Amino acid sequence: MGFLVMIREVSMAKAIRVVLLCVSVLWVVPKECACRSNFSRNSSSSSSSSLRPLRQRPSSVNVGALFTYDSFIGRAAKPAVKAAMDDVNADQSVLKGIKLNIIFQDSNCSGFIGTMGALQLMENKVVAAIGPQSSGIAHMISYVANELHVPLLSFGATDPTLSSLQFPYFLRTTQNDYFQMHAIADFLSYSGWRQVIAIFVDDECGRNGISVLGDVLAKKRSRISYKAAITPGADSSSIRDLLVSVNLMESRVFVVHVNPDSGLNVFSVAKSLGMMASGYVWIATDWLPTAMDSMEHVDSDTMDLLQGVVAFRHYTIESSVKRQFMARWKNLRPNDGFNSYAMYAYDSVWLVARALDVFFRENNNITFSNDPNLHKTNGSTIQLSALSVFNEGEKFMKIILGMNHTGVTGPIQFDSDRNRVNPAYEVLNLEGTAPRTVGYWSNHSGLSVVHPETLYSRPPNTSTANQRLKGIIYPGEVTKPPRGWVFPNNGKPLRIGVPNRVSYTDYVSKDKNPPGVRGYCIDVFEAAIELLPYPVPRTYILYGDGKRNPSYDNLVNEVVADNFDVAVGDITIVTNRTRYVDFTQPFIESGLVVVAPVKEAKSSPWSFLKPFTIEMWAVTGGFFLFVGAMVWILEHRFNQEFRGPPRRQLITIFWFSFSTMFFSHRENTVSSLGRFVLIIWLFVVLIINSSYTASLTSILTIRQLTSRIEGIDSLVTSNEPIGVQDGTFARNYLINELNILPSRIVPLKDEEQYLSALQRGPNAGGVAAIVDELPYIEVLLTNSNCKFRTVGQEFTRTGWGFAFQRDSPLAVDMSTAILQLSEEGELEKIHRKWLNYKHECSMQISNSEDSQLSLKSFWGLFLICGITCFMALTVFFWRVFWQYQRLLPESADEERAGEVSEPSRSGRGSRAPSFKELIKVVDKREAEIKEILKQKSSKKLKSTQSAAGTSQSQHGEIT
């Protein structure tokens, strides 16, 4: 007897027992081990089938189909499945004489009825089941498929938690919502929206899909600010209450993930609430294109509801097979539209048929056996013995997973996670009278304006810079992406935490007048708030007891704990705080400096040496001697003042060199080269003298202050107490970053304690120095009568900002407003209003060593002078060698005469007179050289004339 007949025969009490026992059968988790062992036994027995003789094929094979007939998906799936069955049976190349028989069951949108329908299908010994369309029903009947080893191919269950590990016989032939949520996250990131509100149906598909979206957004530093769940089958009143509540929140970006049969009601209610106007962003998952595609014609009223909505639709590759199927659809369902789930259902049937064809060609047979687990339910009135295990189910499932062919939806192939390969979505913008394609998404290339299949041949590239979409028109006919958020209209003001300071109250402090606080930081915040394009109701809340400065780290933690929406004050932007809150653009520069007592430096008898560094003195002195030697070489042959005994010439070189320092040299330069070198050198001396005079004047006239502490390095190594301000980050920085012992750090309450601790010093219970931020020190030094100064350099660089909760959009708008205040000069005006301090003395000690003139300031002058000397020396020696060459014949005759008188002289000795002659030529006066050359030329002329006369006389005698 059939299953339904059995239910009709029992009484009402027995019917209740039937339901309970059915559910117990479905959720038999403890029986999993037995199922596994039975699975292995059946698979091992079937593995030997290849060794057996060829089996006779059955005349027909039963396949189940389970979905809701009266639904957008079901109305498209049923004719598609029937058409696929007819096509398979008509195709002689597939199954070859075996009739494919599909048994239909209506789940009627009910998990219970769907489960009953699945059990009825199993009674008919089906080898596979196609469906269901609902993820919730798929979860339930997957347990049945696991127990009976029947592959379950769903063309509509997109829930990403339907895992192959939990349900090894479940296979999704459509796209996984895991990829759709990645596509939506990429679109949100592309548009710059960091907070969204998710509106979803409260079932497995809705909850789990939105959960995946939240995880993906978290990786992109975005988040779902609120999850608004809709009860399945909710009426308009419930939806209205939900939308009214989310409309009071700050986010204006809504992701709608509901069922296609009731989803349009969400937009109808939103339209009536004015939530489809400019400033709103609506993003719908594939349910909306499914609903619209299922309509033969989308009427104008429906399109009016959806103006500006962005939707994602399953992308299927355009092909001739797809076009033929779409043309055929008009004959199958002339009054209904065509959606993607019809194609997935059609391909699912063909997938089963092709897998069966491979199954039979491998000489496998279809056999069923009783499940021993079902016989343990003694006393049950349900005929569970009618349910049989498909013995070859595991092998058949492996064949299905290994299939690789092309269907109506494109290539049908599965990856290691049993998902369709190359998932892709079409991005639609609903505007005007029909949806418009603005781009595509795939896990291979992200957002793109070209078809995904054209990019598969290229390397994967999902970088942010590679993302592209066409222009989108948002609700209200807005072409620019909306900001995506507004200040929440829930009647709650912005909670602003303000430190209740007791020191440096010009920055921030308590005030008796509204709004209860005052100071530089408050004025900056108020000025920035006024620049925002929307009103921000706010209330200031003091933090601290008013006796000591509060801990700023604790104040930031209050923002993290949602006790404050923002912390406003002199809050330093440091790395540790940025991990938990979002800071605005800094509105004032800051950094840690060291303040120490100073005293006037004693005058030194060697102060005249301080203008130059040691290297500068050495190079300058060397150049004085070098230039003096160069001038002596160039003038020695021309100028009598540079000639004489060696002692006199050496004195002349030193005297001339250093007398040029004061431009008082009495020796005149005669040669052109000497004058050229001297002019360049006097210019260098002029620059050096002027710089020396200016530097020495500064050193002797400006008050010189000294301190035992020279900067943060000497302070760290001194082992003396260090003062810090209560509540600031300076203490943690010194301990954690500079490894200073906590016992050395002395917290100070206010300016009076600062000055008192510095005056007493470390030996009298005070401190050696204070480490604090520069803005505070500027105020402190105005009241110190120049007794204290900053020493060393600022050793951190940071600023003050306002601390907002993580991912708060208000932080971005406030940063923009602060930049605008800076560009317009308003920040400077506020600074002058509160912090216009005039310092009678310099804040920092001027170190004489830092003001010394070094060689790097003058090396260019010395280089020019050196090049000039080298050029002059080159020209000089070239002239000397030229003159020597002209005197060379006379010297050669004398050398040969010497060789006759001293035949035993060596080769080295024979070359010596030439060098001596060269030295003699260099040492001779220029006038003497010219006279010798003149005489030599005259002798040569006379000898030429004598030779000519002798030649003429000889010619006469011959004649």
From Swiss-Prot:
It is a multi-pass membrane protein. Glycans are attached at residues 38, 42, 108, 365, 378, 404, 443, 461, 576. It holds the Pfam family ANF_receptor. It is found in: Cell membrane; Plastid, Chloroplast membrane. SUPFAM superfamilies: Periplasmic binding protein-like I, Periplasmic binding protein-like II. Residues 635-643, 665-675, 879-959 are cytoplasmic. GO terms for cellular component: chloroplast; chloroplast membrane; plasma membrane; plastid. GO terms for molecular function: calcium channel activity; glutamate receptor activity; ligand-gated monoatomic ion channel activity. Its main location: membrane. The chain crosses the membrane at residues 614-634, 644-664, 676-696, 858-878. Residues 943-959 have a biased composition (Low complexity). Residues 1-35 form the signal peptide. Belongs to the glutamate-gated ion channel (TC 1.A.10.1) family. This is Glutamate receptor 3.4. The lineage of its organism: Eukaryota, Viridiplantae, Streptophyta, Embryophyta, Tracheophyta.
